[in-house]
Amino acid sequence: MSLPGRRASSLPSLCFCVLVLAWAVACQQEVPAGSPSPPPEPASSPWGLVRSKVKEFLEPLVTKTRERWQWFWDPGAFQGFVQTYYDDHLRGLGPRARAWLHSSKDSLLSKAYNLCPQLLCGDRDQG
């Protein structure tokens, strides 16, 4: 199967995205307990098969990932991560940004002055 304007190498990514989208739609269609349930979709229908296969494949993966990252969502661990990130990257950002802007402005003005003919800009030492 060839899609117009697409390379064959993008086809697996497209198929994966379609499968994930189908799984997400199928999961959203599940109704909460207590409400009347729609008639079950026959497993032999094409979308029923896709839904069951995708769910069968992704459910263990999602569960395993959720269990592995549970420590990260603990308030203490998350707060520690944010504090460390702030200490490493954001502390003193204001003064560093001002210094960078000042040096960039000076550098840009110097380059512009060097490009300007002396007749128009005058002597650099005077201004």
Swiss-Prot record:
Subcellular location: Secreted
Protein name: Apolipoprotein C-IV
Signal listed as a keyword: yes
GO CC, one annotated term: high-density lipoprotein particle
UniProt lineage: Eukaryota, Metazoa, Chordata, Craniata, Vertebrata
Originating organism: Tapirus indicus (Asiatic tapir)
Role noted for this protein: May participate in lipoprotein metabolism.
Gene that produces this protein: APOC4
Range of residues in the leader sequence: 1-27
Coiled coil location: none
Disulphide linkage map: none
Principal cellular location given in the protein's record: secreted
Any single GO BP term: lipid transport
